[in-house]
Amino acid sequence: MENKKENAVERLLKSYRRFYNITRFDGGISPPLEEGRNLREAVKLSPFREDERNGLAAVCEYYEKTCQHLFLKSNEIWSANQEEFIFLFTADHLTADLFERCRDYAYNAGMEMAHIGSGHMYTYVSPVFICGKVDDAALNAVENCRIYKTFRFSLHGLLEFH
C-alpha cells in the first residue's frame, strides 16, 4: 500500500508542477524554480510529521499578480495579488484527531505564508489527504471544514480554507 501512496503523491505533484512551486517534505526532490517564479515561502516552514509514513508530504504554492499601468510600468493604477497553497498530507489511517492537527497546521502555515496587505485579493488554503483508510468522523470533519477570514473588512482581501 505504501507504494500506491507514493505513486499517488508523485502523480498528483506531477500535475501541479506546471503552475505551482513545489516544496517536498517527504524526502522527495523539490523541482527547481522556473524562470519568472522566484517566490517560495514553504522552505521557511517546519514540516508536520506524525511519523515516517504520516504527515506533510509537500506544499504547492501559486502566486499571481494582476495590475493595470498608465503609460509607464512605474505608474500602477491598481493591483491584485492572488495566492493559493495546497498542503499535501499522507496518512495510513486518517482519524478525526489527525485531521484536526493537519487542518490547524495547514491553516497556521497558510496564514504565515500569505502576503496580506493592500493589493491582496485572496488566499486559498487547501489541505489534500492521500490515505489508506478514513474514519467516518474524519470524513465528516473533512466534508464540513470551511474557514473564511477577511482582512480589514475585505479591503485587504480574504482567506478561504477548504
Language model: regions and residue ranges:
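Active-site-adjacent loop/helix micro-motif of nuclease/hydrolase catalytic cores
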Residues: 93-112, 136-140
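A short, structural micro-pattern
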Residues: 80-82, 121-122, 161
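Nucleic-acid nuclease catalytic cores
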Residues: 116-143
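Structural motif
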Residues: 88-93, 129-133
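Short secondary-structure junctions and interdomain/linker hinges
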Residues: 19, 23, 109-117, 149-152
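Short secondary-structure capping micro-motifs at structural edges
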Residues: 73-75, 106-117, 144-145
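Charged, structured surface patches that assemble and position nucleic-acid processing machinery
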Residues: 145-162
